[in-house]
Amino acid sequence: MVLSVNDRKEIMGKFQASAADTGSPAVQVALITERIKYLSGHLKANPKDFAGERGLTKLVGQRKRLLSYLKKKDFAKYTQVTKELNLRK
């Protein structure tokens, strides 16, 4: 699933450090989290979609790596992101 332009702008607006910030770890984690939420719902409706399941696993791993990096580099931003996205630490 591709997020619509408006959805992406809304998500980025919450986590951007500046107007031009589109690739910071916080923004990436927020966008990946939205894709994970969509795929989770899709897999509940389509349990035999193994390619989708693999994609979900890859996204979860990517988000985990980004969160680990963010935790090392900027712990305050990490706690803010995990709290706003309701992610476990």
From Swiss-Prot:
**Can you supply a Gene Ontology BP term from the record?**
translation
Q: Which PROSITE patterns does the UniProt record give?
A: RIBOSOMAL_S15 (PS00362)
GO terms for CC? cytosolic small ribosomal subunit
Q: Which Pfam families match?
A: Ribosomal_S15
Entry keyword annotation includes Ribonucleoprotein: yes
Sorted alphabetically, the keyword list is:
Ribonucleoprotein, Ribosomal protein, RNA-binding, rRNA-binding
Q: List the disulfide bonds.
A: none
Q: What is the protein's known function?
A: One of the primary rRNA binding proteins, it binds directly to 16S rRNA where it helps nucleate assembly of the platform of the 30S subunit by binding and bridging several RNA helices of the 16S rRNA.
What is its quaternary makeup? Part of the 30S ribosomal subunit. Forms a bridge to the 50S subunit in the 70S ribosome, contacting the 23S rRNA.
Which HAMAP family does this chain map to? Ribosomal_uS15_B
Instruction: Provide the family line.
Output: Belongs to the universal ribosomal protein uS15 family.
Spell out the protein name for this chain.
Small ribosomal subunit protein uS15
Organism of origin: Elusimicrobium minutum (strain Pei191)
Q: What is the lineage of its organism?
A: Bacteria, Pseudomonadati, Elusimicrobiota, Elusimicrobia, Elusimicrobiales
Originating gene: rpsO
